[in-house]
Regions:
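Conserved Lys-Pro-Asp/Glu-containing loop-to-beta segment of HAD-superfamily phosphomonoesterases
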Residues: 186-204
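Short, surface-exposed amphipathic charged segments that create phosphate/polyanion-binding patches used
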Residues: 172-188
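Short, flexible loop segments at the rims of nucleotide/cofactor-binding pockets, characterized by
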Residues: 102-108, 185-192
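Short, Lys/Arg-enriched N-terminal segments with co-localized hydrophobic residues
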Residues: 1-3
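Alpha-helical substrate-recognition element adjacent to the catalytic core
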Residues: 5-166, 170-171
Length: 204
C-alpha cells in the first residue's frame, strides 16, 4: 500500500509472508523450555485455532461478492479474538531476549536487501516514509528483526514505526505478563479491516 503525501511517498508494508517468506509467529511462540511445565505446546493452540477457523468458514458459507467478503473479514475477528485470549497464558514469564535469540531463523523474501537499500536512499532524501502494519503478536520482535537484518545487509534501518500487537510486560521489566495488547492505546490488530483502518489513520 503506498500513497503520496506532500510530495513524499508513504509506504505501508505487511510483515509475515510479505517481507518474510513465512509466518513468524512460531518464532515468537516460546520454546518448550521457556514455558511453565503445565503449559501445552504451541502446536496445541495452532490446532485449536484451525478447528475454530474451519468451523467458522463452513458456517459462513460460500463467498460470491465483495459485500460478503467484507462481512467475512469483519466476522472472522471473533475467531482471532478467541485464539488470542486462549493463548495469552502461554507467554507468561517469557521475555524479549528469548524471542530475540530466534531472529536468525527468519527467512526474508528475495530482494528484501535491495529494498532496504532503496528505502534508505529515499528516506535520506526525504522522499519516503515507511511503516509496517501487521497482525503479528510482537512489534518488539519485528523491530529487533528489522534492525538485525539491516545491520547484516550494511544499510540503515529506516522503517519509521511498526504498528503491530505487543506482548505486555511487567513495569520496569521485559518479562511478559501473558497478555497480548494492541499498538499503543489502540485496539488489537487482528483482521484485514483492522489493518486498513490503521493504514488510513497513518495516511491521514
Amino acid at each position: 500500500y503506498a500513497t503520496m503525501t506532500s510530495r513524499r511517498l508513504l509506504l505501508l508494508l505487511d510483515w509475515d509472508g510479505t517481507i518474510t517468506q513465512h509466518d513468524t509467529l512460531n518464532l515468537i511462540a516460546p520454546a518448550l523450555n521457556e514455558v511453565k511445565s503445565d503449559s501445552p505446546d504451541f502446536s496445541v493452540y495452532q490446532d485449536e485455532y484451525m478447528r475454530d477457523y474451519t468451523e467458522f468458514k463452513t458456517m459462513f458459507g460460500q463467498i460470491t461478492n465483495r459485500e460478503q467478503m467484507y462481512d467475512y473479514l469483519r466476522s472472522i475477528r471473533m475467531v482471532e479474538e478467541r485464539s488470542l485470549n486462549r493463548i495469552n497464558c502461554l507467554f507468561e514469564g517469557t521475555n524479549d531476549a528469548q524471542r530475540r535469540s530466534r531472529i536468525g531463523k527468519i527467512c526474508y523474501r528475495k530482494g528484501w536487501a535491495a529494498m532496504q537499500y532503496w528505502m534508505a536512499q529515499r528516506v535520506a532524501s526525504h522522499t519516503l516514509a515507511a511503516y509496517i502494519v501487521s497482525v503479528n503478536w510482537s512489534r518488539t520482535f519485528i523491530s529487533d528483526a528489522l534492525k538485525a537484518c539491516a545491520e547484516q545487509n550494511g544499510v540503515e534501518q529506516v522503517i519509521s514505526y511498526v504498528y503491530a500487537n505487543e506482548l505486555a510486560t511487567k513495569p520496569g521489566s521485559d518479562e511478559c505478563t501473558g497478555l497480548i495488547q494492541g499498538p499503543g492505546q489502540r485496539e488489537r490488530i487482528l483482521t484485514g479491516p483492522d489493518k486498513v483502518k490503521m493504514c488510513e489513520a497513518i495516511a491521514s
